[in-house]
Amino acid sequence: MHITMVKKRLADGSECRKCQEASEHLHSRGLWDRIDEVVWAQEGDAASPGMQLSSHLGVDRAPFFVVRERSGAQTVYVSVLQLVKERLGEAVTVQEQVQAIDPDDIGGI
């Protein structure tokens, strides 16, 4: 299994907030070393590797994760908690799930 994390770098050079939070979550659980590759989607640069991968896979948010199996099958995860639970074999608490809800992702709030 090969895990690629796609992170967004903003036009000012900083890493997006959600990408920082996802990285911190993986580090805090001791799972960062399970990420095999980090690819950057540069804001405003459609030719950047992360933007190309995002376009190819039809993903419109960052971070996201691409898990490739030896068989060539791949699965895309847009949630670090879903990745942790389904692919990294770690439990995810209800509290973590609630804390991961971002009002920016919910319309009308």
Please tell me what each predicted stretch does:
Residues D36-V39, S54, V67-S71:
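Solvent-exposed, well-ordered amphipathic alpha-helical segments
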Residues P63-F65:
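Compact, well-ordered interaction domains used in eukaryotic information-processing assemblies
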Residues M1, D33-W40, V98-G107:
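Charged, low-complexity, helix/coiled-coil-prone segments
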Residues R9, A41-D45, E69-R70:
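Short beta-alpha junction loops
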Residues M1-E37:
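Local sequence-structure signature of Cys/Sec-based thiol-disulfide redox active-site neighborhoods
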Residues V6, L57, V76-V80:
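Broad hydrophobic/π-residue packing in well-ordered secondary structure
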Residues V67-G108:
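Non-catalytic, surface beta->alpha helical segment in thiol-disulfide oxidoreductase systems
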Residues V39-R61, R87-Q95:
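Thioredoxin-like thiol-disulfide oxidoreductase module
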